[in-house]
Amino acid sequence: MNTKAMLETLNEITLLVDEPLKNVTFTKTGGPADVLALPKTKKEVEEIVAYCREQGLSWLVLGNASNLIVRDGGIRDVVIMLTEMKEIKVAGTTMIVDAGAKLIDTTYEALAADLTGFEFACGIPGSVGGAVYMNAGAYGGEIKDVFQSAEVLLADGTIQTMTKEDLNFRYRHSEIQELHCIVLQATFALEKGNHAEIKAQMDELTELRELKQPLEYPSCGSVFKRPVGHFTGKLIQDAGLQGLKWGGAQISEKHAGFIVNIDHATATDYVELIAHIQEVIKEKFDVELQTEVRIIGEEV
């Protein structure tokens, strides 16, 4: 990749060369991206994708890098991170939100407008684009419950509006995962509610999260999808794995469904510990755990 030419051509866009992705991931692990692009507008995203297409460069998108592990060898693609695109607009009972906006911020803007429906997401640390990508959910709610449409940039450079039907949401999945495209903005349909009741529910869910989840350590959030008929955390507990340390990573003593970075863990520590958990759970209970966390990048 000719990074000098890219910097010269896209000189108005923030481009970081050989940027360690441990600086942006919630696990505080991960190798460097050859180029990390931080667009501030839809137009800048279009320009980056157009340049990559013209030069034959591959690209990928990161949301808030919360439910993500980047391997220690890093990423050779152009990495596009949308955290600078974070406008949140409210129009009646509709919210129009840039993909890089934090989901937590979005829920509190809904509260400020006395809008109900987003309470379930008040503690989910991801971005709005990432939440649409994986149909994020918690405490009985999912993004699909409030989703109306998304503005998406396709790989060929065209922008398309996709509906709930188009995205075919299911558990921790949307059609965005099958398409090489970028969520630029999402529209959500909420309802008018009582401010005090909305706040009380959000406070209750926040308290639950703080009580049950290891928020005091870096982590990638929930590591595994919930297998049918089981609770992942209980399987890991019953297997005697809770508290297991692997390098600088550890299965949380607070919630066995989380792996925390307790001592300068590497992405390799995380990936190997995940594989070990999967192997043990398969052997003991004949249950195959599938990762919810997205694992990308190259080995060292």
From Swiss-Prot:
Cell location: Cytoplasm
Cofactor: FAD
PROSITE patterns: FAD_PCMH (PS51387)
Protein name per UniProt: UDP-N-acetylenolpyruvoylglucosamine reductase
Domain FAD-binding PCMH-type: 28-193
Annotated EC: 1.3.1.98
UniProt keyword NADP, yes or no: yes
The reaction(s) this protein catalyses: UDP-N-acetyl-alpha-D-muramate + NADP(+) = UDP-N-acetyl-3-O-(1-carboxyvinyl)-alpha-D-glucosamine + NADPH + H(+)
Family: Belongs to the MurB family.
KW Oxidoreductase (keyword) present: yes
Record keywords: Cell cycle, Cell division, Cell shape, Cell wall biogenesis/degradation, Cytoplasm, FAD, Flavoprotein, NADP, Oxidoreductase, Peptidoglycan synthesis
GO molecular function terms listed in the Swiss-Prot or TrEMBL record: FAD binding; UDP-N-acetylmuramate dehydrogenase activity
The protein's annotated pathway: Cell wall biogenesis; peptidoglycan biosynthesis
Pfam families reported for this sequence: FAD_binding_4, MurB_C
Catalytic center residues: 172, 222 (proton donor), 292
